[in-house]
């Protein structure tokens, strides 16, 4: 890894990584099925970038990274996976002033053999992933930290993205179909957050934390049966700190009230398909199914931390 000042205002960096990974596994998984893996990978992951100081407190940057990642044990248990490969291009702008900190980041990610969630789960409840050929993620991320005055702090953020399989095939009713571009599973196109903090003293602070997650699919075939609806949830967080005596340096009391408006939503679930070959002899019918994990309504956590 190296960083170098190239000329006035310009700084470059380069980061070279060489990874070697070996998998050797032999045994049994669910039931009498045998499980054997003997794979070795060598990955070269280079990264380089350029930063330009536009003005005091403002920087523009561009970077490129090539990343390669091996499958994990669960991937091997559920198939014959290949390592995924990524070319990542990013362009961004940072602002850092006493009243405003902001960052804009635009990314373009080209994947080959990306290991994506299928929506299905295995016999022990672990999510199943599979390689999907070519896929792409493009997006923009905006983050702000604004000091409104000496007591109020505002921290909004938003991420807009397009997350797609580029040439997805699916076997429906016994016939292999090219679905073309489909949405990647568990990849909402819109995610936003907001925090408004009130800090009247160094001892006490209270904040309202909000999060919005847009509609997403739990599978890769754009089936409405696999939809996770958009949701908006708000939490309240408070912290009070004091120093009682020389024996206890600090006592910190915290309160986190989750989902203060008691929103009814599901943030996760699973989706599966199977071929029905027995209901109608000589006919194959693809059946879709889904399950959801409802989230708790209003709930709270409180705690006390002592520092001696």
PLM segments and residue spans:
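Transmembrane beta-strands of outer-membrane beta-barrel proteins
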Residues: 12-16, 60-62, 102-104, 154-156, ...
């Amino acid at each position: 890894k190296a960083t170098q000042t190239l000329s006035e205002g310009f700084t470059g960096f380069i980061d070279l990584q060489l990874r070697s990974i070996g998998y050797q596994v032999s045994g049994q998984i669910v039931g009498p099925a045998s499980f054997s893996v003997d794979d070795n990978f060598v990955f070269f992951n280079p990264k380089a970038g350029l930063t330009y100081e536009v003005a005091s407190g403002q920087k523009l940057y561009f970077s490129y990274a090539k990343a390669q990642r091996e499958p994990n044990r669960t991937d091997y248990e559920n198939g014959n996976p290949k390592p995924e490969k990524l070319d990542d291009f990013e362009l961004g702008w940072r602002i850092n002033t006493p009243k405003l900190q902001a960052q804009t980041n635009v990314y373009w990610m080209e994947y080959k053999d990306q290991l994506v969630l299928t929506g299905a789960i295995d016999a022990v409840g672990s999510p199943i992933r599979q390689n999907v050929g070519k896929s792409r993620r493009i997006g923009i991320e905006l983050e702000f930290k604004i000091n409104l005055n000496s007591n109020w702090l505002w921290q909004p953020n938003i991420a807009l993205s397009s997350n797609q399989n580029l040439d997805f095939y699916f076997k429906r009713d016994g016939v292999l179909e090219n679905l073309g571009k489909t949405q990647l599973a568990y990849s909402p196109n819109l995610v936003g957050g907001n925090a408004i903090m009130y800090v009247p003293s160094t001892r006490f602070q209270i904040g309202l934390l909000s999060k919005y997650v847009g509609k997403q699919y739990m599978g890769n075939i754009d089936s409405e049966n696999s939809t996770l609806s958009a949701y908006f949830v708000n939490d309240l967080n408070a912290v009070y700190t004091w120093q009682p005596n020389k024996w206890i340096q600090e006592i910190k009391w915290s309160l986190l009230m989750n989902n203060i408006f008691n929103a009814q939503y599901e943030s996760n679930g699973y989706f599966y398909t199977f071929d029905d070959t027995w209901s109608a002899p000589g006919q194959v019918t693809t059946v879709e199914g889904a399950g959801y994990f409802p989230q708790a309504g209003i709930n709270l956590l409180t705690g006390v931390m002592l520092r001696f």
